[in-house]
Amino acid sequence: MNINGYTRMAAVVANPIKHSLSPFIHNLAFDLTNENGVYLAWEVEAEKLPAIVDNVRTLDMYGLNISMPYKTEITPFMDELSPAAELIGAVNTVVNQSGKLIGHNTDGIGFFNSLEKYHFNIQNKQMLILGGGGAAIAIIAQAALSGAKKIVVAARKSASYIPLKEKLEKLSVKTGIEILLTDLSEADRLQKELKQTDLLVNATSVGMDGESLPLEKSLVLPEKLLVVDAIYKVRETPFLRWAKGQGAQTENGLGMLIGQAAESFYLWTGKKMPVAEITLEMEKEA
């Protein structure tokens, strides 16, 4: 990395963020593509967000990545939102276009781009996704925008279940895609939906302990099913081991992590991130 008077900045903004892998990914991408940029991690309090946004314009930055807890809080500061960001109601990438700040959400498109190596396209396919948090909503919204045939969301019945149901109903109306919510504990219903499923995704945190499964292990998976776990800190979760044991193709969350970064990098620089090389380096770091 050769920092000089022409070097431009990008940064990830969150709290906490010092543990983030994003600086490693993006700075390696800058080096590999000969792009004169540097990427930092900024851990800031919520009241500093307006100043951070002003910095993007003042310092002519590429833009920002936004992580928890600011993905929704940052949206009012944007001049424009991409279709995905507007649909999701959250921004994870800010792009500076000559002072005009455009909010994008690359989580969903990054997720599906990471599945291209399996020649998987969600169009006219059915997805069953476990969980209803931010990552799940981004994946659901992108699946709907990409023309999925049907999306089934399985979540635990809790205080957030009814708000999730209402959010999914709005997504369904806006996109014209069938999106259903079911109780994650209803194994019979899940088994019925699994028979028609092409893509099974775990977007919960269950499995981070290396022991827990997010669903009943008695469930039988159909043939030719692609199974993905959004967790990347545990490279093969119990969920993926269980699916692999039934003959399914499996993918961990590292692809989504790098995929969303690659989409942000392209929006900032117009260059394709060398995903294969970066994935290899990330695996060495594990």
UniProtKB/Swiss-Prot annotation:
The record's Gene3D superfamilies line, in alphabetical order, gives:
Leucine Dehydrogenase, chain A, domain 1, NAD(P)-binding Rossmann-like Domain
Q: What class of enzyme is it?
A: oxidoreductase
Q: Name one GO molecular function term.
A: shikimate 3-dehydrogenase (NADP+) activity
Positions of shikimate binding: 20-22, 67, 92, 107, 232
Q: Quote the catalytic residue positions.
A: 71 (proton acceptor)
Q: Which UniProt keywords apply?
A: Amino-acid biosynthesis, Aromatic amino acid biosynthesis, NADP, Oxidoreductase
Instruction: Indicate which residues the UniProt annotation says bind NADP(+).
Output: 131-135, 230, 253
Catalytic reaction annotation: shikimate + NADP(+) = 3-dehydroshikimate + NADPH + H(+)
Q: In which pathway does it act?
A: Metabolic intermediate biosynthesis; chorismate biosynthesis; chorismate from D-erythrose 4-phosphate and phosphoenolpyruvate: step 4/7
Task: Kindly list the biological process annotations in GO that this record carries.
Answer: amino acid biosynthetic process; aromatic amino acid family biosynthetic process; chorismate biosynthetic process; shikimate metabolic process
InterPro entries named in the record: Aminoacid_DH-like_N_sf, NAD(P)-bd_dom_sf, SDH_C, Shikimate_DH, Shikimate_DH-bd_N, Shikimate_DH_fam
Q: What is its EC number?
A: 1.1.1.25
Q: How does it assemble?
A: Homodimer.
User: What HAMAP family does the entry give?
Assistant: Shikimate_DH_AroE
Q: Which family does it belong to?
A: Belongs to the shikimate dehydrogenase family.
Known function: Involved in the biosynthesis of the chorismate, which leads to the biosynthesis of aromatic amino acids. Catalyzes the reversible NADPH linked reduction of 3-dehydroshikimate (DHSA) to yield shikimate (SA).
Fetch the NCBIfam families from UniProt.
aroE, PRK00258.2-4
The protein's name: Shikimate dehydrogenase (NADP(+))
